[in-house]
């Protein structure tokens, strides 16, 4: 692969308090990383429980994709990383049943 044909990959990292979109450019020998967007990940507190604001995160995902595709027309793939200790429940038809619950302070204290 020559220097003019770098492959580009879009990655999203959704952390406990913020997230970001990063484009990785790889020429076969060297990987360069460029942050495309960064955003807050603030939970929604309802009835004593912290929930992920999945609609806001979905919006930020779309914003990051648009920004990356505007700058780089030839993105090869997309990857997404989130906290592994939180989860969402899906119905049989694959609809999200409710916003995923963030790990709670009382749960953390038990660990």
Predicted regions and their residues:
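N-terminal glycine/serine-rich phosphate-binding loop of ATP-dependent small-molecule kinases
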Residues: 1-98
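Surface "functional belts" at beta-alpha junctions
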Residues: 101
């Amino acid at each position: 692969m020559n220097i003019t044909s770098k492959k580009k990959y879009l990655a999203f990292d959704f952390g406990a308090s913020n997230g970001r979109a990063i484009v990785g450019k790889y020429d076969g020998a060297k990987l360069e990383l460029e942050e495309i967007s960064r955003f807050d990940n603030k939970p929604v507190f309802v009835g004593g429980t912290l929930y992920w604001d999945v609609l806001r995160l979905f919006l930020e995902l779309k914003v990051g994709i648009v920004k990356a595709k505007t700058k780089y027309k030839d993105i090869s793939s997309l990857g997404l990383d989130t906290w592994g200790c939180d989860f969402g429940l899906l119905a049989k038809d694959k609809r999200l049943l409710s916003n995923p619950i963030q790990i709670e302070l009382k749960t953390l204290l038990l660990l």
